[in-house]
């Protein structure tokens, strides 16, 4: 979660109107993770896929708290 927010702040630091949107990228990482895992699904073991998707879902469980 922190990495997404820091990347957003890095690119929008000099834009005062956009700096308040730092929480939005936090909620989008699961979509990217699912896309990447499905693309490489033949090369990733089932255990690793389960761990990556589970970690991403736990990470996104905190997104509504931050967004509200």
From Swiss-Prot:
Q: Which InterPro entries match?
A: Na/H_antiporter_dom_sf, NhaA
Keywords on this record? Cell inner membrane, Cell membrane, Membrane, Transmembrane, Transmembrane helix
**Presence of the UniProt keyword Transferase in the record:** no
- What is a single molecular function from GO for this protein? sodium:proton antiporter activity
Transmembrane ranges, per UniProt, are 21-41, 48-68
GO BP annotation list: regulation of pH
Extract one GO cellular component term from the record: plasma membrane
What membrane topology is given? Multi-pass membrane protein
Q: Where found in the cell?
A: Cell inner membrane
Which Pfam families does the record match to this protein? Na_H_antiport_1
Q: Does the keyword Cell membrane apply?
A: yes
Q: Which family does it belong to?
A: Belongs to the NhaA Na(+)/H(+) (TC 2.A.33) antiporter family.
Protein name per UniProt: Putative Na(+)/H(+) antiporter NhaA homolog
């Amino acid at each position: 979660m922190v990495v997404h927010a820091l990347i957003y702040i890095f690119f929008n630091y000099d834009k005062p109107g956009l700096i308040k949107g730092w929480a939005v990228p936090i909620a989008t990482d699961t979509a990217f993770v699912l896309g990447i895992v499905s693309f490489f699904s033949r090369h990733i073991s089932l255990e690793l896929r389960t761990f990556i998707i589970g970690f991403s879902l736990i990470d996104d469980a905190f997104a509504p708290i931050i967004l509200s």
